[in-house]
A protein has these predicted regions:
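Inter-Walker segment of RecA-like/P-loop motor cores
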Residues: 2-57, 160
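Catalytic micro-motifs at enzyme active sites that drive phosphoryl/nucleotidyl and oxygen chemistry
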Residues: 47-50, 80-81, 106-107, 179-180
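Short, surface-exposed connector motifs at secondary-structure boundaries
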Residues: 56, 60, 87-90
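Walker B catalytic acidic pair
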Residues: 62-64
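ATPase catalytic-site recognition across NTP-hydrolyzing enzymes
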Residues: 127-188
Length: 188
């Protein structure tokens, strides 16, 4: 993500003459109005803690579906929410639905936490990909996918679709849950 964003910012600077100042040593881009864009990771608690301290008017988390719930919830609730408070800032999360349909990003999207605004789109909604429809039909045919195939629905339609086949430990409520009442004191 960092490399992609860094290169994209460089392309935008050249295309639009934004007069951005790139500081590669700390992955910071200075804007002419005095604002900064800081790129970095948050894969573990040490990296999350590096975001403590400054105030942010906007914090953006890309590929949020890939982050462990404990890390993402700590980053948002313990670090970024307090850091955006002073400037009445915002936190944006982006990502593609994951195969497990679980985690902080899933909960924020599906259960519509009151503080989160939801937005979604499909590959076909992108106006910069004029051949996307034909490409996607070829991809579906090459892979033997139909409109119900979980990877197709997640990656190209942006839908939360649990994919039991891609799980390390496949869980099925029919197979793994037993409906029975235990005798009182069973666990004693």
């Amino acid at each position: 993500s960092r490399r992609i964003l860094w290169n994209t910012l460089g392309e935008m600077d050249r295309a639009f003459g934004l007069d951005l100042e790139f500081r590669q040593n700390d992955l910071t881009v200075k804007l002419s109005n005095g604002s900064s864009i800081v790129l970095g990771g948050a894969q573990d608690r040490d990296e999350v803690d590096k975001w403590r301290g400054p105030k942010y008017s906007l914090a953006v988390i890309d590929e949020a579906q890939s982050m462990r719930t404990s890390i993402l919830s700590t980053l948002i609730e313990d670090v970024l929410e307090p850091a955006t408070l002073d400037l009445d800032g915002s936190i944006w999360m982006f990502g593609t639905p994951n195969a497990s349909s679980s985690g902080f990003f899933y909960d924020a999207d599906v259960f519509e936490r009151s503080s989160w605004s939801r937005h979604n789109w499909t590959l076909l909604d992108n106006p910069h990909l004029p051949g996307a429809g034909a490409w996607l039909e070829r991809r579906k045919e090459e892979n033997g996918w139909d409109n119900e195939t979980p990877i197709y629905r997640r990656e190209y339609l942006g839908e939360w679709t649990r994919d039991e086949e891609s799980m390390v430990y496949r869980f099925s409520a029919d197979r793994n849950v037993v409906e029975t009442e235990l005798e009182e004191g069973f666990w004693d």
